[in-house]
Amino acid sequence: MNNLKVIEEKNGVLDEITGEEGIIRTEREIINAYISDEYGNKVNTASCYVAIELAISPSVGSPFIFHATTQLNNWCNPYRLYICGMDVNPDIDVEGDGKLCPQLDKWIMNSYKAVDGIKYAYGEYRPSSDDKKHPLVIWLHGLGEGGTDPSIDLLANKVTVLADVPFQKCMNQAYVLVPQCPTMWMDDGKGEYKSDTKDSIYTKSLFELIDCYVKENRDIDTNRIYIGGCSNGGYMTMEMLLHYPHYFAAAFPICEAYHDEYITDDQIDMIKHIPIWFTYAKTDHVIDYTLCTEPTVKRLLAAGASNVHVSVFDDVRDTTGLYKNEDGLPYIYNGHCSWIYWDNNECYDGNLNAWEWLGQQGN
């Protein structure tokens, strides 16, 4: 198969400033090719399937496009891989039938309509049935993952890791609920960012969804309900704590966007008992941590909070050794993407690990 060549053709962003979109063609690097079964598993017998492994990087191979107009991620449409050297012309069906996502195998896609008419799509992971109570972990997505397709919410920021063995071991087998709002959590009702003391249009209905999910799954331990998320989802995490301070056993807001000036002293007193683990990077130019996380942490500690932790990173960089800049140094991500450290279980406060800490919390 030495004569193989793969050309990727997809719609993408042509101009980062204007947001202009168009078709982009790229030759992909082939790192392996072999005879396989229909799921891509290597076989040593005759088969009508061939698996081709392609190199990826933070800037190469994503099947998603971030639309500047809607501020939402979506599946690239079209997304085609032209394979030269073989008599095939595969086309990934963006509606779902033609793509395999093993990361989603453990997840169930569902939906919920609240009494106010707001409809949520959501992904859920359910632990094996037994006679034990299980914690519930709730993940709230960022700006780009709103919409009606929860697979985007699960895949765009590696949320599927919450169903994998390392995280589940720390949680002692947890339910995971990943709600997707139709727009953005910070929606003020007019499609604009909420920037004052008014509630998000999703505050009440999101809690309704969570509470209904807990009541429908009677083996969820109501003393171990954990909530967190990134950016817009970090904002909504804080919103949930401020409105329902005795419901959640712990929280893990990441690069959260809730401006501290809108949190009253009385509200600080109401949430100071909640175990909270904050995460952010100093190079975040999307959310100003000096207006959000940093002053809120100071006020919580001053009010006597005894279980507040913070992971602060100088920047967001690749720690796997797989991705490098042109100078050979580790690839530097947008400083807003501090959720990468959370997803990779790299958040610490001294010797204390965030995942292990979360699994130990309870009302």
Where are these regions (language model features)?
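A domain-start/cap signature at the N-terminus of enzymes
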Residues: 1-134, 296
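Active-site machinery of serine-nucleophile hydrolases
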Residues: 136, 143-204
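Primarily recognizes the serine-hydrolase "nucleophile elbow" in alpha/beta-hydrolase
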Residues: 214-217, 222-270
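Short, proline-enriched alpha-helix->beta-strand connector loops that line the catalytic pocket
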Residues: 172-174, 270-276
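Short, solvent-exposed loop/turn and secondary-structure capping segments
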Residues: 63-65, 147-153, 187-192, 239-240, ...
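Gly/Ser-rich "nucleophile elbow"/oxyanion-hole loop immediately N-terminal to the catalytic nucleophile
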Residues: 128, 132, 190-231
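C-terminal catalytic histidine-bearing segment of alpha/beta-hydrolase fold enzymes
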Residues: 277-279, 283-297, 301-363
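The conserved beta1-alpha1 loop
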Residues: 140-142, 255, 280-281
